[in-house]
Amino acid sequence: MPADEREAGVHTLPITVEYGNRTLTLTPTLVETERGPVLIDAGPEGSLEGIRTHLRSLGYALEDIWLVVLTHHDADHAGGLDELLEAVDAVVATHREEAPYVTGERDPIKGDGDRYPPVDVDLELAGGVRIPTLAGPMDVLETPGHAPGHVSLYFPEDGFLIAGDALVADDVDGTLSGPKPEFTPDMDRALDSVGELATREIEHVVCYHGGYVDSGSERIRELSERGLED
């Protein structure tokens, strides 16, 4: 993140966890509001202490989190939510198409048997919802494909995007790329979502897989035009 991220009100919270048979570095994000911090994605099981440490470094207690927004229901984003909610009295929000997977009414869409403890969803999101933050308005964008109700969060005043898994940057060189086909059930919708992102003015992106990327609209348009081929 830029050096002035503390003033900007948006902070990446990179955590390294054991997930399945892999060691992953993942990037939840904290967004400051007048009410307190909002957490974007909770990480998988075992993420709690890493998130707590990041919040402490920013001058917050874990208990200050009042809202958790899930970009989608995959276990590496939502599997740690039950543990988090044991320590935090927070509102849980996700897209209405993702809610049944989070609450346990449906099994995870990718069918990998990675069923985490279900939690209640308090607020169902839809595209066009705007959340006021200290970094300016944060708009909910519907970016389905990687998951049926995947959302990304867009800050139009600064051209800043929290992509979730609609975009990734976890290759060796950190290049901004489209979602990985092997983890994306509906690549046609995913490509449409990249095309939608290409219509926005974006200068900087945070990817859950890859972290902060200092590139935006030009690269996203390339991905859309090439059909995610690279």
What is each residue range found by the language model?
Residues 38-40, 69, 92, 160-162, ...:
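Residue-level marker for buried hydrophobic side chains located in beta-strands
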Residues 31, 41, 51, 72, ...:
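Divalent metal-coordination and catalytic microenvironments
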Residues 7-17, 109-113, 134-136:
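Short Pro/Gly-enriched beta-strand edge/turn motifs at strand-loop
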Residues 2-58, 152-170:
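Conserved beta-strand hairpin/beta-sheet module of binuclear metal-dependent hydrolase folds
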Residues 46-48, 54-130:
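Active-site HxH/HxHxD metal-binding segment of metal-dependent hydrolases
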Residues 6-8, 87-88, 201:
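Short, structured coil segments at secondary-structure junctions
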Residues 122-144:
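Internal catalytic-core helix/loop-beta-alpha segment
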Residues 45-46, 137-144, 148-227:
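Metallo-beta-lactamase
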